[in-house]
Design a protein with these regions (language model features):
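Extended, low-polarity segments enriched in aliphatic/aromatic residues
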Residues: 3-264
Length: 264
């Protein structure tokens, strides 16, 4: 990341929002302290976009929302490169570009509450398919705002079952590193990653697939398609091998995880 930002994206800015839950990033002051401790402030500019307020973006064709609350400063930028660590997620089942944008661009106090709680009165009152749809509608607000000036990169490496936003240590990673998926189509990017996970041997994918299916996470993909956000039919191009078109099964051929049976 440091090399990328300094040599290739030296004029770029990382954007963040404060978190909905407590911890080291729930207020702007603590968030900036966390960025400093982790070294980000030493080599790049980080804009906590909801530090100075929020803005509402329209949600085209939304079922749950007509608009979504985002960090106000995000509207200052004319393009967005979405860099995502693809992995499991406590509520989303998996976290790809859709989760990164849907939760990550919604501001910490209003937008994230709209997704997670709605009118339930409970901080985490929304789950399963409804959560996937609300999160996807939030993503739609950001994707529609940037139009054709947005791209998506999913890094399929160190794919833990839980996201680091859970605030607890995840189980040991057993899913092997696969590679990096990039696209101008958010649905194609996330669909390709999911297809690669499913193409893994059972012992390597078991925990991650169980997490995805138990959370109804495929609704992320089907709802993106219903909302016209992208195409789930794609070509997987292997840039390391002469731009050859490959299948998900070919992409994961020969990779091995470190899964060890617990005897049960």
């Amino acid at each position: 990341m440091k090399e990328l930002l300094q040599k290739r994206l030296s004029e770029g800015t990382i954007i963040e929002t404060n978190t909905y839950y407590g911890g080291g990033r729930d207020t702007t002051e603590r968030h900036r302290q966390t960025l400093q401790v982790n070294g980000w402030a030493d080599f790049t500019t980080v804009d906590i976009t909801d530090a100075e307020g929020t803005a509402m973006l329209p949600v085209p064709n939304g079922k749950w929302f007509t608009e979504m609350s985002v960090g106000k400063n995000m509207l200052q930028y004319d393009s967005l490169l979405t860099l995502t660590h693809f992995k499991g997620h406590t509520m989303g089942g998996f976290g790809g570009s859709n989760k990164n944008l849907g939760i990550g661009c919604a501001d910490g106090k209003i937008g994230k509450k709209m997704i997670h709680a709605g009118e339930t009165g409970s901080q985490w009152g929304i789950n399963n398919e409804e959560f996937m749809e609300r999160m996807t509608e939030s993503t739609q607000a950001t994707v529609s705002h940037f139009k054709d000036k947005i791209a998506f990169i999913n890094v399929m490496r160190n794919m833990s079952v839980d996201c680091d936003c859970a605030g607890t240590s995840a189980k040991p990673v057993v899913t092997p590193d696969i590679g990096i998926v990039a696209s101008l189509d958010i649905l194609a990017a996330d669909q390709a990653c999911v297809d690669c996970v499913y193409a893994l041997p059972e012992e390597s994918k078991h925990d991650l697939v169980e997490r995805m299916e138990s959370r109804h996470s495929m609704r992320q993909l089907t709802y993106m398609k219903e909302m016209g956000m992208g195409n789930d039919r794609y070509q997987l191009i292997d840039m390391d091998n002469g731009d050859k078109v490959i299948t998900a099964a070919e992409a994961v051929k020969g990779v091995k995880g470190t899964w060890v049976s617990d005897g049960n």
